[in-house]
From Swiss-Prot:
Membrane topology field: Multi-pass membrane protein
Annotated TM spans: 399-417, 425-449
Leader peptide range in chain numbering: none
UniProt KW Cell division keyword: no
Protein's gene: ISC1
Name the UniProt record assigns to this protein: Inositol phosphosphingolipids phospholipase C
GO cellular component, as recorded: cell periphery; endoplasmic reticulum; endoplasmic reticulum membrane; membrane; mitochondrial outer membrane; mitochondrion
Regulation: Activated through localization to mitochondria in specific growth phases.
Gene null: resulting phenotype: Eliminates endogenous IPS-PLC activities.
Catalytic activities: an N-acyl-(4R)-4-hydroxysphinganine-1-phosphoinositol + H2O = 1D-myo-inositol 1-phosphate + an N-acyl-(4R)-4-hydroxysphinganine + H(+); a mannosylinositol-1-phospho-N-acyl-sphingoid base + H2O = mannosylinositol-1-phosphate + an N-acyl-sphingoid base + H(+); an inositol phosphomannosylinositol-1-phospho-N-acyl-(4R)-4-hydroxysphinganine + H2O = mannosyldiinositol-1-phosphate + an N-acyl-(4R)-4-hydroxysphinganine + H(+)
Keyword Transcription: no
């Protein structure tokens, strides 16, 4: 469906502009020096949990209105406004990647409100109870889409956490920019529920990041400029972050602009300076939903990791820090992250003709870092494998014990019914509870438990294969 804007686009295309340039307006600016087109991204975790997220409808509508250019949000500081300008004027993006869009009605409102400004839209679907919550709004034509579902993604027994039920995934969108094909990989990786231990789910996120890095390499080798965006639930320097940068060959757009930062120094800054200098999108004290956190808990979890061969960061920062006036609350429990990238046009090749792997294996320091990452990953998998095997065993044991208890309850009922008829009700309820819990644990043990263990072993073997290859390379040196 084409509107007046679409007709204007095609009229401008006749004058020699690509569709991307026409749609992108002033953002698609070609630099005389670098001969690069710029494209502006936004990634935002919208906190759209049904029944759980407070003021969900009002917040999601405020987000949609702001993206559409009709916002009445109140800034918390003029320093946080891009270039010190008007909030609405600076919220003009080319591509918007959203996470936690888990209610269809929220998506319908977003899509409708932003249709004229962002005509290319996509909500991704997977999971059991709801989708992965991933969506994209774009001024740039979408060429193709693909959803990769993480095989290792939490446990069905963690019902109150929900990661397994929503089907955490990677939403891949290929954009037709008219300059160079871009593959945007939007994801919301497994959440940590503790800093240490089993509830931290480090192994799950590391396995997800490992799979992620495989996909990134494939797309890079195919000639795409890859951009990974989303709430990756991993701090800078963590194992998942290393897989997505050192292993996959991407760079952190924020670090490309500001350099690597000492997280301990960022933790000691004031909340406002943490946003300005550390881009702490999560757990900031300036976010009303995280006001009870400690200052040193503020961190950066929302990213745009980019292909350094074809992309260069020229601007980046925290966005959507404003509040909804009548509710006096932030629009999400995360702040958004935005970056403007220069794209090297096709034909201006900067990537070596050899594969990504071969190009990187000539950097000995990087090889040693990757080797260390593999060792850490194997240790991480071994640690969690013990937990997975133990849980599978005890859930299976519960299943067989439930069968014995069920038989025993039936036998006991026949004897007690003659002496105390009312006791039959107790034994029937007991049998029902035993049957339900035993069946659930049995299914988790025999179906999920086996699948998870095999998936972990497969990742371990993949890491070992990569490690053996690096060992061969290092021994040759």
């Amino acid at each position: 469906m084409y509107n007046r804007k679409d007709r204007d686009v095609h009229e401008r295309k006749e004058d020699g502009q690509s569709e991307f340039e026409a749609l992108n307006g002033t953002n698609a600016i070609m630099s005389d020096n670098s001969k690069a087109y710029s494209i502006k991204f936004l990634t935002f975790n919208t906190w759209g949990l049904k029944y759980v997220s407070k003021h969900r409808k009002e917040r999601l509508r405020a987000i949609a209105d702001k993206l559409a250019g009709h916002s009445m949000l109140t800034p918390i500081s003029d320093e946080l406004l891009p270039n010190g300008g008007d909030s609405n004027e600076n919220e003009d993006y080319d591509v918007i990647a959203l996470q936690e869009i888990w209610c269809v009605e929220d998506w319908k409102y977003l899509a409708s409100a932003c249709a004229s400004k962002y005509p290319y839209q996509r909500l991704f679907h997977s999971g059991i109870l709801t989708g992965p919550g991933l969506a994209i709004l774009s001024k740039v034509p979408i060429e193709s889409t693909f959803l990769y579902r993480f095989p290792i993604n939490g446990r069905p027994s963690a019902v109150f956490r929900g990661d397994w039920y929503v089907g955490k995934s990677i939403a891949i969108t290929v954009l037709n920019t008219g300059t160079r094909p871009i593959a945007i990989m939007n994801s919301h990786m497994h959440a940590p529920y503790a800093k240490q231990g089993d509830a931290a789910y480090l192994c799950h996120r590391s396995c997800q990041a490992w799979d992620f890095s495989r996909l990134i390499k494939l797309y890079r080798q195919a000639g795409y400029a890859v951009i990974v965006v989303g709430d990756l639930n991993s701090r800078p320097g963590s194992l998942p972050h290393k897989f997505l940068t050192q292993e996959a060959g991407l760079v952190d757009s924020w670090e490309q602009l500001h350099g690597k930062q000492d997280l301990a120094v960022i933790a000691r800054l004031s909340p406002l300076q943490q946003l300005l200098k550390g881009c702490t999108t999560c757990d900031s004290l300036l976010n009303t939903w995280r006001a009870q956190r400690q200052p040193d808990e503020a961190c950066r979890l929302d990213y745009a990791l980019i292909d350094p061969d074809f992309l260069q960061t020229v601007d980046a920062g925290v966005r959507f820090t404003e509040r909804i006036p009548h509710l006096d609350c932030s629009v999400s429990d995360h702040f958004a992250y935005s970056c403007t990238l220069n794209i090297v046009p096709q034909g201006t090749e900067s990537r070596p003709s050899t594969s990504v792997k071969r190009a990187k294996t000539h950097d000995r320091e990087l090889i040693l870092q990757r080797y260390s990452n593999y060792e850490t990953m194997i240790e991480c998998i071994h640690t969690y494998l013990k937990t997975a095997q133990r849980q599978k065993f005890f859930r299976g044991l519960h299943f067989w014990a439930s069968i014995l208890l069920l038989i025993a309850s039936l036998v006991v009922t026949t004897f007690t019914a003659n002496k105390a008829g009312w006791s039959s009700i107790f034994w029937v309820l007991f049998a029902i509870a035993v049957s339900i819990s035993g069946t659930i644990d049995g299914a988790i043990s025999f179906l999920f438990g086996r699948s998870e263990i095999r998936a972990l072993i497969e990742v371990e073997q993949e890491v070992l294969d990569a490690e053996h290859h690096l060992q061969t390379f290092l021994s040759e040196k």
